[in-house]
Amino acid sequence: MANRLKEKYTNEVIPALTEKFNYTSVMAVPKVEKIVLNMGVGDAVSNAKNLEKAAAELALISGQKPLITKAKKSIAGFRLREGVAIGAKVTLRGERMYEFLDKLVSVSLPRVRDFHGVPTKSFDGRGNYTLGVKEQLIFPEISFDDVDKVRGLDIVIVTTANTDEESRELLKGLGMPFAK
């Protein structure tokens, strides 16, 4: 069974973007390439259990086992040594990526307190969009009782678009609620 968001992309977004930007080929139309979820756990330096809990939460949110990220170099001010585990990340592609994006847009973002849309300034100039989430509780998989500490995460949506304008139209077509 094809994903609801993928069908919307094929049936509605591709024709709309082709008309707006005058693409000659369907392959020239931008698409979402991957979504990277990153959770930096700074307090994992003093307590390794925190990283395990964060990784378990990230696995619940994404439906995929996270990769533990390690410090690249030592920083004395943060009491950090090279090679110490300090975060977790997940790269979603294909079916899981569309499922996550659908869940993010239709369920999770509306659960954010005082939500007025995601900022339009978070594009990087190359058509990718970065979104910071302050608490993991907005995701329906995370139970309030199981959370020991509120942690945020970064969500990077990588697209094949060449410009921010193309990427913005793509994400708007997929239902991303941008602030007015």
Curated annotation (Swiss-Prot):
Gene3D superfamilies: 3.30.1440.10
Any one GO BP annotation for this protein: translation
Keywords in alphabetical order: Ribonucleoprotein, Ribosomal protein, RNA-binding, rRNA-binding, tRNA-binding
One example GO MF annotation: tRNA binding
PROSITE patterns from the UniProt entry: RIBOSOMAL_L5 (PS00358)
Origin superkingdom: Bacteria
A GO CC term attached to the entry: ribonucleoprotein complex
Function recorded in the entry: This is one of the proteins that bind and probably mediate the attachment of the 5S RNA into the large ribosomal subunit, where it forms part of the central protuberance. In the 70S ribosome it contacts protein S13 of the 30S subunit (bridge B1b), connecting the 2 subunits; this bridge is implicated in subunit movement. Contacts the P site tRNA; the 5S rRNA and some of its associated proteins might help stabilize positioning of ribosome-bound tRNAs.
Family in the record: Belongs to the universal ribosomal protein uL5 family.
Subunit structure: Part of the 50S ribosomal subunit; part of the 5S rRNA/L5/L18/L25 subcomplex. Contacts the 5S rRNA and the P site tRNA. Forms a bridge to the 30S subunit in the 70S ribosome.
Protein name as it appears in the record: Large ribosomal subunit protein uL5
Native source species: Streptococcus pyogenes serotype M1
Lineage, opening ranks: Bacteria, Bacillati, Bacillota, Bacilli, Lactobacillales
